[in-house]
């Protein structure tokens, strides 16, 4: 997890962006969020771009969006998550245009080149760390819309230039970090060149120098509105979940786990161990038994080095992997071979585990009920496993890569028909999922937030311990404690990276009015 904290620039509201600094919090129509580690705030910053006098409205919008996208990395490295994907929600109503002329002060007789300077104000919902709950502003920077032509320079000046940054060279906006000393130095040098060249302009209000138009970095001030995080208790709709949604008298958890490593895609991938850790935690709370596996496999017998190894239950397979509690009489090579044999039968298979329980809501009569886990390990870039799990689960949980928003969970891959009509929780435990996989799902769900709660991460989430954290989240949901969302987030605190819940404020369940008993 990247936790570099932004060093404040010596910039106030008079930075190069337009000077209006107050945040109009009424601009946000989003519900407040529930979180343990994050605070929900409205964010604003201003910038400008230069375009040709003949530029169309769409060309101007594209130029502004190219610039606002570069704020993503600047905000991410400052530990701020934003809600609109890649900051594309630009409001054209904030645009102000001014005709300017590019001139060469050393050649006053030359007519210069006409251009249009377009200023804008960008507003978004944001999540910040708790220790930034009262901070009103911070200095950042955005880049020129044509920044892609200078990737090498940006990589060297304004990224850590490590393997992580180099991996993202083609999406340099993701790793742009204006807080770095080398970046501040580069911006200061660029600004000095602009100031020196502009010193002899006869009319600085209408004239600009080529150094200004060609600048790569544009300092700006990010203003933060009041803390609007939900201060009350909110709960999943336990009464609806334990009434049966996608299946009668059954609560279905859809767990999809993706490969995490860049090597071989099998049970040696670190994501496999995380998946097993999730199942281990769930098995601690309820007596889950194997109900089915597709494609069909015999999970009771394994041939290892000429020996036949028997398993009494699915719990044995989990214990072999997570606790190294393998049968006696196996050599070290046999033990490795057994784990490999188990993995070969599980990876790429749909496994259904079921646990019978009895539920009672308030003063109602007890009734038989089933908790199911529909799970799959081995997801990659195909949306097929994710679609199956989402369509057939009441609580969908994904653990894997985010693919910078363009992977299998891209909302563009889904339609309303891909979601059940019943109440549902989606927990997308990937990096920066609050930006990629949050608000765009709400219109895809019939009833919107009346039928959908979302749990996402504002920042990059660590893979290590993710399985344990998600397992704790699941186990608290099914242990009968009526855990609030805050308590569920605390249960999964091992990997909390500005994790937030959205869509929960219109939930009606209240255990003080009608407690759910699960036995």
Each language-model region and where it sits:
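Short, low-complexity, disordered segments immediately C-terminal to signal peptides
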Residues: 24-35
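Active-site-proximal C-terminal subdomain of hydrolase catalytic domains
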Residues: 425-519
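Bacterial N-terminal signal peptides that target proteins for export
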Residues: 1-10
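Long, solvent-exposed N-terminal ectodomains/accessory regions
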Residues: 33-136
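N-terminal Sec signal peptide cleavage junction
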Residues: 19-21
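Non-catalytic propeptide/linker segments at domain boundaries
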Residues: 101-346
